[in-house]
């Protein structure tokens, strides 16, 4: 999902829409992605927590597994990169706030990129063994 948002959806908007409309379309796509990311992170947390507890009870690991840390990291990137920065970006776009829109946009992009890497690492760890 993350790679589709980054590689297809936002690029397609830039290709076919006027610049004034691209921000609205990309914002909507990213809002949906952020909400889906939170829901998926909660679901993965519940599944992986059960697995980590079973492994810890069998003496094969910790209750706080590396997979759980990757989920927490991706969730943090979603909360910080979208839910915290988005209101600040709106204020900056309106000429309010102390941080420039471009700086906030760059920070948001960095969180999205880091989240993508964390999710790819989790997929690799959970893949066929």
What are these regions (language model features)?
Residues 36-44, 111-122:
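Hydrophobic cores of alpha-helical transmembrane segments in multi-pass inner/ER membrane proteins
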Residues 72-87, 112-116:
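Mid-bilayer segments of alpha-helical transmembrane spans in multi-pass integral membrane proteins
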Residues 9, 85, 119-122:
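Hydrophobic/aromatic residues in alpha-helical transmembrane segments
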Residues 1-4, 36-37, 71-81:
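Alpha-helical transmembrane segments of multi-pass integral membrane proteins
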Residues 59-75:
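Interfacial segments of alpha-helical transmembrane regions
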Residues 29-30, 67, 99-116:
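Individual transmembrane alpha-helices with interfacial aromatic-anchor signatures
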Residues 125-129:
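Short, charged juxtamembrane terminal tails flanking transmembrane helices
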Residues 1-42, 46-55, 93-98, 102:
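Interfacial loop at the N-terminal end of multi-pass membrane proteins
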């Amino acid at each position: 999902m993350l790679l589709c948002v980054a590689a297809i959806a936002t690029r397609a908007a830039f290709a076919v829409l006027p610049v004034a409309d691209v921000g609205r379309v990309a914002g909507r796509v990213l809002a949906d992605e952020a909400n889906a990311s939170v829901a998926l992170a909660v679901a993965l947390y519940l599944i992986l927590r059960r697995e980590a507890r079973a492994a810890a009870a069998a003496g094969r690991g910790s209750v706080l597994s590396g997979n759980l840390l990757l989920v927490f990291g991706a969730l943090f990137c979603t909360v910080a990169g979208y839910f915290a920065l988005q209101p600040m970006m709106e204020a900056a776009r309106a000429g309010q706030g102390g941080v420039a829109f471009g700086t906030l946009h760059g920070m948001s992009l960095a969180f999205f990129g880091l989240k993508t890497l964390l999710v790819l690492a989790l997929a690799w760890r959970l893949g066929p063994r």
